[in-house]
């Protein structure tokens, strides 16, 4: 199984997953720019696409999203330097482009997706509490009996 030859469980119905990452924010504590966490996007993206699922990336407002610096495997801190999945995603132009033009959460049609996954990072702690459109979509997935998952600081949507 690979990205080129996915093992599709049901060829007539590809499962579809919406992954939501945060728009850029500024920490009210440190005053530093914060964003989504690379591995909380890239690892689920890799797992789902390897299983043959179609994955689309969204953000509350749409547009370009920025990752937290320390989540970048190339960051001088070395904090995430062993994250080869994120490095591969970042180094692949087609994949890296997915975070430069995200669609807004408002455009998610719950009936056309099987799951929603909300990635974490530091920005969700400063932006998801007021992302009422994201709250509504997440609740709609849950109400429809679909998978609704929030990773790490992505649980800030529950505040």
List where the protein language model places each region:
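Structural detector of well-ordered beta-strand residues that form the stable sheet scaffold
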Residues: 148-149
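Rossmann-fold NAD(P)-binding glycine/threonine-rich loop
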Residues: 153-155
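Extended, subdomain-level signal for the structured scaffold at the beginning of enzyme domains
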Residues: 1-144, 157-159
């Amino acid at each position: 199984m690979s990205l080129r030859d996915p093992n599709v469980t049901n060829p007539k119905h590809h499962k579809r997953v919406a992954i939501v990452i945060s728009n850029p924010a500024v920490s009210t504590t440190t005053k530093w720019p914060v964003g989504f966490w690379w591995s909380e996007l890239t690892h689920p993206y890799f797992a789902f696409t390897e299983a043959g699922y179609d994955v689309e990336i969204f953000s509350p407002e749409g547009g370009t999203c920025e990752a937290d610096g320390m989540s970048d495997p190339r960051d001088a801190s070395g904090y995430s330097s062993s994250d080869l999945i994120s490095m591969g995603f970042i180094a692949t132009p087609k994949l890296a482009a997915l975070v430069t033009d995200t669609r807004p959460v408002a455009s998610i049609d719950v009936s056309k997706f099987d799951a929603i996954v909300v990635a974490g990072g530091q920005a969700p702690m400063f932006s998801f509490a007021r992302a009422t459109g994201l709250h509504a979509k997440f609740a709609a997935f849950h109400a429809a009996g679909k998978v609704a998952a929030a990773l790490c600081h992505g649980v800030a949507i529950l505040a």
